Swiss-Prot record:
This is Mannose-1-phosphate guanylyltransferase. Signal peptide: none annotated. CDD domains: cupin_PMI_typeII_C, GDP-M1P_Guanylyltransferase. The gene is manC. The keyword Cell wall biogenesis/degradation does not apply. It comes from Escherichia coli (strain K12). The lineage of its organism: Bacteria, Pseudomonadati, Pseudomonadota, Gammaproteobacteria, Enterobacterales. It comes from the Bacteria.
Length: 478
């Protein structure tokens, strides 16, 4: 019997606020390089090398779509495989969208879905792939498999799964019926769980047939399935994106896959996985899984430590030094600095809530912002002016646009700029500049083979990004 098609489904939603100031609403942790040269999303996809599967399906928030597309493009994995959620509705609806898409793509069969989170670290990738292979026969037989992480300490930050009887399966394949899903326990209870040998950490990773998941969702949460079917019935293809119907999806209830299906179904089984797994839920957990110096420090960027022990020090720009401290987390970005006791980093989320309550922007966006055409860095700002460094990738261009409240000056630093102002086209080289009057229709393009760098000086009564009227845009943002 031929093996069923396997669709990896990578859930790339979430804001990762406990890793602020690196992780922010518009650039959360799954898109960051926290370990090595690849982002967490890219590492998750590369982990599938050696697993016979189709191109991965990525589910993300609409505002992250160009980040996901660029990171997939860098891996040569970009197809029409990015499902956009108009708003987060937790994991049960997200997986339902992916299941409906998989069934639509393979109508002749009931394909398998390997559901993964984009922000997990797995040290032993061979063990991960072995667990997936172990789970395949159970999923093909109609079971809903969850992967249980073999615990190595009494962690209170994870939910647990209590295993039941051994589930019937092929020789050398080990899975257990799920006896119970358990919420995050206190320390004493977690210690008892680990000592019993009957409990696993709940990883949030799953393997099942798309049709079986939809059957169980229809049985237990038909309202979720109905909303997702309506959302998928009016899909709007957009470049490499699958844009679901916004009104239908916003009507969908929020629910996790555990609550909606896994805790209710009679067909849930747990496959153990002992692979050095972490969900990197805090700065302390990132410190724990990273390579340490002899003094127990983890350092990134331009860092000098003196008599510093067991600390995490991250410098995004410029030099960061520490003297005579221990057990600290120090994270410096271009517009914010975090200094925290390593044992109190769970409260970083409260700082983020305060920043949001104060009406500040540092919880939402970095100083450096990525766009489909490149990026910009807000260098300076004051009363009625703002200075940015803009980088446009070769062959890319900004939308044809105008502004009601600001004029702009552009000075080319490197590369060649093709500038159109009210129909007049000019080519600018290094050290050349141009003025865009308030209200002028204009466009910036990079016709060259190297990145275009320019300095933009905005002046006017209102300088925010929402002062823009787009007339044409190659990225569908009109």
């Amino acid at each position: 019997m031929a093996q069923s098609k396997l669709y990896p489904v990578v859930m790339a939603g979430g804001s990762g606020s406990r890793l602020w100031p690196l992780s922010r609403v518009l650039y959360p942790k799954q898109f960051l390089c926290l370990k090595g040269d690849l982002t967490m999303l890219q590492t998750t996809i590369c982990r599938l090398n050696g697993v016979e599967c189709e191109s991965p399906v990525v589910i993300c928030n609409e505002q992250h779509r160009f980040i996901v597309a660029e990171q997939l493009r860098q891996l040569n994995k970009l197809t029409e495989n990015i499902i956009l959620e108009p708003a987060g509705r937790n994991t049960a609806p997200a997986i339902a969208l992916a299941a409906l898409a998989a069934k639509r793509h393979s109508p002749e069969s009931d394909p398998l879905m390997l559901v993964l989170a984009a922000d997990h670290v797995i040290a032993d990738e061979d063990a991960f792939r072995a667990a997936v292979r172990n789970a395949m026969p159970y999923a093909e037989a109609g079971k809903l498999v969850t992967f249980g992480i073999v615990p190595d300490l009494p962690e209170t930050g994870y939910g647990y799964i209590r295993r039941g009887e051994v589930s019937a399966g092929e020789q050398d394949m080990v899975a257990f019926e799920v006896a119970q899903f358990v919420e995050k326990p206190n320390l004493e209870t977690a210690q008892a769980y680990v000592a019993s040998g009957e409990y696993y950490w709940n990883s949030g990773m799953f393997l099942f047939r798309a049709g079986r998941y939809l059957e169980e969702l229809k049985k237990y949460r038909p309202d979720i399935l109905d909303a997702c079917e309506k959302a998928m019935s009016a899909v709007d293809p957009d470049l490499n994106f699958i844009r679901v119907d916004e009104e239908a999806f916003l009507a969908c209830p929020e629910e996790s896959v555990d609550y909606a299906v896994m805790e209710r179904t009679a067909d849930a089984v747990v496959v153990p996985m002992d692979a050095g797994w972490s969900d990197v839920g805090s700065w302390s957990s990132l410190w724990e899984i990273s390579a340490h110096t002899a003094e127990g420090n983890v350092c990134h960027g331009d860092v000098i430590n003196h008599k510093t022990e067991n600390s995490y020090v991250y410098a995004e720009s410029g030099l960061v030094t520490t003297v005579g401290v221990k057990d600290l987390v120090v994270v410096q970005t271009k517009d914010a600095v975090l200094i925290a006791d390593r044992n109190a980093v769970q409260d970083v989320k409260k700082v983020v809530e305060q920043i949001k309550a104060d009406g500040r922007h540092e919880h939402r966006v970095h100083r450096e912002v990525y766009r489909p055409w490149g990026k910009y860095d807000s260098i300076d700002a004051g009363d009625r002016y703002q200075v940015k460094r803009i980088t446009v990738k070769p062959g890319e261009g900004l939308s044809v646009q105008m502004h009601h409240h600001r004029a702009e000056h552009w000075v080319v630093v490197a590369g060649t700029a093709k500038v159109t102002i009210d129909g007049d086209i000019k080519l600018l080289g290094e050290n050349e500049s141009i003025y865009i009057p308030l209200g002028a229709t204009h466009c910036l393009e990079n016709p060259g083979k190297i990145p275009l760098d320019l300095i933009e000086v905005r002046s006017g009564s209102y300088l925010e990004e929402d002062d823009v009227v787009r007339f044409a845009d190659r990225y569908g943002r009109v």
